Amino acid sequence: DKSFYFSSARNTIRKNYGWNEEPFLDVYTAEIIGGTVKNANLIIGDINTKYHEGNVAITADGKRMYFDRNDYYQGKYKKSEEGISQIHLFSAVKENGVWKDIQPVNFNNSEYSVGQPALSPDGNTLYFVSDMPGGKGMSDIYKVSINKDGTLGKPESLGDDINTEGKEVFPFVDANGTLYFSSDGHMGMGDLDVFYAEANGGVFLGVRNIGTDINSSGDDFAFKYDPNIKEGYVSSNRKGGVGSDDIYAIKLIAPLCDFELIVQVVDEITKLPLADARVDLFDNFEN
């Protein structure tokens, strides 16, 4: 059996968040029993506050967590000069089943957001999302080395192959080292789509859309995948869901692959090929 961590606004007794009039997010944990997620409860410890707590990444030994929350630490709630409480990254350690010793990362800043953590398979690199100055788009994906003493190095952008002028969010690196993320800047099927890029010499190259049925005409994000069992999860606000955003279980039934589409345009009468003809290709969602 395994643990399943997720964030939810299901606690309706909580104060509503002004931007969407839903309760603030909390982190929950559940059990995966026989392929089914059961027994969801608030995470035990000092993670959750009266503000937003969202994405988590946990080391392989289960002893350290990286998570994001509003700019709230040691009872102090801070805002930027524009009056916005940014999202910040924190770490916590697990002792006797309880998450405690909350510490902010060294590159948090009240003027921009830093969040959505993910870890490399070897646990030596932390990936995150930020709109810090110097980025290419609305939000970019960065990486930072994790030193042996637990301190973090200097953030480094994943570069122009990954980041666009739009939003790149929710990074995840699977056991094979493949990076998955969501973007509205790469060519997709809807709003946020899930993309992937394989590691090559320390960098990620060859961004590809993961395709349907993972992606929809809405927002698809927070993709998690275990290549050993070929199963995972994705969050989406696609039509047919129960709430604003829902979590869906996925299973790989065919290998991801590229294909070459060869199209020839001919004259309707002569049937001879037409040079420099424009071809528009649409999917089932009219994209």
What are the roles of these predicted feature ranges?
Residues D1-Q264, E268-T270, L274, R278, ...:
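Short, conserved micro-motifs composed of acidic
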